[in-house]
A protein has these predicted regions:
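Extended, hydrophobic alpha-helical segments in both membrane/secreted and soluble proteins
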Residues: 82, 197-199, 233
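Short leucine-rich amphipathic alpha-helical surface patches
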Residues: 157, 173-175, 201-209, 216
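Outer-membrane beta-barrel "beta-signal"
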Residues: 41-44, 201-210, 226-237
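Conserved active-site loop/cleft motifs that coordinate metal ions or position small ligands
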Residues: 165-168, 209-215
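Secretory-pathway-linked proteins and extracytosolic
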Residues: 2-8
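C-terminal outer-membrane beta-barrel translocator/porin domains of Gram-negative envelope proteins
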Residues: 11-162, 167-186, 223, 236
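Glycine-centered small-residue hotspots that permit tight backbone geometry or close packing
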Residues: 121, 127, 196-200, 208
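A short alpha/beta connector and helix-capping loop motif
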Residues: 180-200
Length: 237
């Protein structure tokens, strides 16, 4: 529902039967299971960007809640995501994006693996493989986390109306989720976050925004690559 030119309220309902199978080494956090989820999700959006595809000023804020328990698995989630754009000098544009999220089960139910947060890739923490940041099991498989913290900073320069180059710094981490070989933190710990820098381009194709980027890890761990190439479709932040 539109409240004004810039503000919207949303209310969604979702019902799903989800099955996880072919887990080779089941754990209490990731195992073969079938769960029924019935959830209600209210949200609030405020968007003052001057252009949805290539903004140079304004901001976008999203607050979302999820409550599942009207039948099936019981859990709740809360998240805030915000982006702000501002002109710096000439055509140069600054962008800051942040996201904080929390989730947990209740009434003796645990948070399902498919409802945990995952990080890494072109639309979260660049320079890292998709979903490969945060808690892992003893074999190195991502477990996801119950808490997520992400920061993205960009300097953007529009070469043409439909082509924009950018340089970035990303910082983020997941917390919780059990046995963890990448960080021992189970709650917020700003000292145990991952960092990357890089650059890329975005352009407007006939099918929508498309992006290419390369990110370099600033805190490469043993066995990790120096960085990652990324391809993305759709708006990043």
């Amino acid at each position: 529902k539109s409240l004004s030119e810039y503000d919207w309220l949303g209310l969604n309902y979702n019902y799903a039967d989800i099955e996880i199978s072919d887990v080779q080494v089941p754990t209490i956090y990731l195992k073969n299971e079938t769960r029924t989820t019935s959830r209600i999700s209210p949200s609030f959006i405020r968007d003052t960007r001057d252009n949805f595809m290539n903004p140079s000023s304004g901001s976008r804020h999203v607050v979302r809640l999820d409550l599942a328990g009207l039948g099936g698995t019981k859990f709740h989630k809360a998240s805030y995501e915000g982006s702000h754009y501002w002109p710096i000098i000439g055509k140069l544009v600054g962008m800051v994006h942040g996201e904080i999220a929390w989730a947990d089960g209740y009434a003796a139910d645990s948070l399902p693996a498919f409802e945990r947060y995952y990080m890494g890739g072109p639309k979260s923490l660049r320079g890292y493989q998709i979903r490969n940041v945060g808690p892992k099991d003893s074999l190195g498989n991502p477990l996801g986390g119950n808490q997520s913290l992400l920061l993205n900073l960009e300097l953007q320069y529009p070469f043409t109306k439909g082509l924009r180059g950018f340089a970035f710094y990303d910082r983020g981490q997941l917390y919780g989720g059990g046995n963890d070989t990448s960080t021992t933190a189970t709650t917020w710990d700003l000292a145990k976050m991952r960092d990357s820098i890089g650059a890329g381009v975005r352009f407007l194709s006939p099918f929508g925004p498309v992006g290419f980027a390369y990110g370099v890890k600033l805190d490469k761990a043993t066995g990790e690559t120096d960085g990652e190439f990324h391809f993305s479709a759709g708006n990043s932040f």
